[in-house]
Amino acid sequence: MPARHLYFIMTNTWNRLALLIFAVLSLLVAGELRAGVVVGGTRFIFPADRESISILLTNTSQESWLINSKINRPTRWAGGEASTVPAPLLAAPPLILLKPGTTGTLRLLRTESDILPVDRETLFELSIASVPSGKVENQSVKVAMRSVFKLFWRPEGLPGDPLEAYQQLRWTRNSQGVQLTNPTPYYINLIQV
């Protein structure tokens, strides 16, 4: 076995071992883990016939959280249409203070929809950052979290049923592996291939 392959295997093994040790030690010193803000969904659909949609935010902790929200063009997922034009949707209010044990509502508003395609869905990113308040107490850590959710703009009158769109996916084997083609106007999320 060449030395560089052995080095890679050992490095990979040592990295896994170091990660396992770090995880175990983190659990031993963690003491107490508290949840923060829960967002009412994992992906959101904005129908074109609506002026706005609402998203529920729930503070499950004993401290206040500052929530910062914004909508961007997609950068994290394949299939997103690259564009330099700002998203024609707005998160309001952009800053929300959630007191302990309360809920708040984030509204997504359309600013102009005539620049979006009418023959297919458009993908956006809804970015929600949660920042804890208060002082850090002895031997504890506070972590700000940024979650990014898929937000789909769905024009009116698209053909077919979005819940059945996955049945129209076309799988083709080629020299590089398998190619998947989606002939529908809907984005389809695959859980497992």
Task: Kindly give the residue locations of the regions a language model identified.
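Intrinsically disordered, low-complexity Pro/Gly/Ser/Thr-rich segments with frequent PxxP/GP/PP motifs
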Residues: E81-D114
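Buried hydrophobic-core signal for structured, non-transmembrane domains
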Residues: I53-N59, L108, F124-A129, V178-N182
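Short acidic, flexible loop segments centered on an aromatic residue
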Residues: S61-S83, P185-V193
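Beta-sheet-dominated interaction scaffolds and their linkers
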Residues: A35-T60, G160-R173, G177
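Bacterial N-terminal signal peptides that target proteins for export
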Residues: H5-I21
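Terminal connector regions
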Residues: S113-E156
